[in-house]
Design a protein with these regions (language model features):
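Short Gly/charged-rich anion-binding patches and loops
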Residues: 36, 70, 94
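Conserved HGGG/HGGXW glycine-rich cap/lid loop of the alpha/beta-hydrolase fold
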Residues: 8-57
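Active-site acidic short loop of glycosyltransferases
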Residues: 7, 16-18, 43, 76-82, ...
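Conserved hydrolase catalytic core segment
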Residues: 81-108
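Active-site loop/oxyanion-hole signature of alpha/beta-hydrolase fold enzymes
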Residues: 39, 48-86
Length: 108
């Protein structure tokens, strides 16, 4: 079972130590989609998974740019840097946009 943290308006998983691996879930996903990945990689990586506010953001803000902005705010709030970012489905698209707009924050 994943330990979900709540801090400064964000819900997220933050487990393990080592280089940071940030995972973004898809449109119909949630934090639990990544549980097996957390179990496998948290011994080697700091695995961070924010809960994307797909259904709680105002509809006009819930597009790709709004979600990218949310991820930027999340990264700044918890102080992430030099991370590997990846996602599945919609989360993969948001991860790509984040990396393109913030190349100094990602290692791959």
């Amino acid at each position: 079972m994943l330990n979900v943290k709540q801090e400064k308006g964000f819900q997220y998983v933050d487990e393990g130590n080592g280089p940071t691996l940030m995972l973004l879930h898809g449109l119909f996903g949630a934090l639990s989609n990544w549980e097996a990945v957390v179990n496998r990689f948290s011994s080697q990586y700091r695995v961070v998974i924010p809960m994307l506010p797909i259904y709680t953001m105002p509809i006009k803000e819930a597009g790709l740019e709004g979600l990218r902005s949310f991820v930027e705010d999340f990264v700044a709030t918890i102080g992430l840097d030099n991370m590997v970012i990846m996602g599945n489905s919609l989360g993969g698209h948001v991860a790509l946009l984040y990396a393109l707009h913030n190349p100094t924050k990602v290692s791959r």
